[in-house]
Design a protein with these regions (language model features):
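Substrate-binding clefts and catalytic carboxylate motifs of secreted carbohydrate-active enzymes
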Residues: 6-180
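Active-site groove signature of glycoside hydrolases
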Residues: 1-3
Length: 180
């Protein structure tokens, strides 16, 4: 499988560079796969990864999620290319609170982002982060989606901010670029 992906994507990568007179960077997103066997993503100009440590992987265990994510970041750092965490998040039911940050509470979503962002902030090669998602959105019904809704938004479907929206306002509102 990794070789088949490379054989498909790498010629497109080369063609994009060949056709672009401005020589803009080319990337693709590495989803929840075995990153150590991925031979395609590492050939791109920018490494983009979608990761859900602490949510789908190591669900609710933020300490071990941070450990696993740091281990993966160690791997990507050896590739010597800029990295963007292109998708990450935790479902949150707006208005659901708890004394401890348990999954689906607004407090957990904030702790999730603090944990993952703490890992990112330690790495100079990380050049961006894209939380999933701006706002909750409708999805196909199923056992993982209460009310047929993906609730990873920083805002509700009605655009009411969750606690995480305030967290990111503070995070992104800092003046210095390295003052993450």
């Amino acid at each position: 499988f990794p070789q088949d992906a490379y054989d498909y994507w790498h010629p497109l990568y080369e063609l994009a560079h060949q056709l672009d007179p401005q020589n803009r960077p080319v990337t693709l997103v590495c989803c929840q796969n075995d990153y150590t066997k991925d031979i395609t993503t590492r050939t791109m100009d920018i490494v983009c990864i979608n990761r859900y440590y602490g949510w789908y992987n190591l669900s609710g265990d933020l300490d071990n999620a941070a450990y696993a994510f740091k281990k993966e970041l160690d791997f990507w750092e050896t590739i010597d290319k800029p990295l963007i965490l292109s998708e990450y998040g935790a479902d949150t039911v707006a208005g659901m609170h708890g004394f401890a940050p348990e999954m689906f509470t607004e407090e957990f979503q904030v702790e999730y982002y603090r944990t993952i962002n703490g890992c990112l902030d330690e790495r100079r090669f990380v050049v961006g982060e894209w939380p999933w998602n701006f706002a909750d959105f409708s999805t196909q019904q199923g056992p993982m989606r209460v009310g047929s809704c993906n609730r990873k938004g920083l805002f509700t479907r009605e655009r009411t901010p969750k606690l995480a929206a305030h967290y990111f306002r503070d995070r992104w509102g800092k003046k210095e670029p390295n003052d993450r």
